[in-house]
Amino acid sequence: ETDTGMLFDVLLHVGTLIAICAVYYKDIVRLFVEGICIVRDVLINFAALIKNLFLSIRDRGKDHVDYSPYRRIVNSSYRKFVVLILVSTIPTGIIGFVGKDVVEQASELLIVPGICLIATAILLFIADRCKGGDKLPKDITYTNAFVVGIAQGVATLPGLSRSGTTITACLLSGFNRKFAVKYSFIMSIP
């Protein structure tokens, strides 16, 4: 690929990122804040774990030991949203890393983008006909998020629409239509 082609791809992705940030800026800020709070609570729980281990060793044999309580990490829809995005990112990263050479070779064959464009059309047809569901972050399982991450990883093939693939995967997993679109675009940021 030429430098001009690479520059075009980078600028295209930057433009998409700017558009996503403009549309979902309130959600992105809230997700960022909740992500920081998740890290804080994990560190507090780790400190409580160390303290409780020390207390259990020190106070072995006593009838009552005053253990430190643990904080619940995923205690809101936005925190669940953050964790779901992280779960979706794992298979995407693995597929992207492992399949890098396959994607590069597939880009050189005209038949692959052609087949993938047809696959995109079929996926968009399915998404249009799919009733979807009513799942919001609190109802979505981590398995659902993992499957959507796999769909995003597969969508690195040339000609396969990333958003079309992930929105279809979301709808087939029972996501609410509006949330499926939001999830698809926000999960493209990391």
Locations of the language-model features?
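Multi-pass membrane proteins that catalyze or facilitate reactions on polyprenyl-/lipid-phosphate substrates
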Residues: 1-190
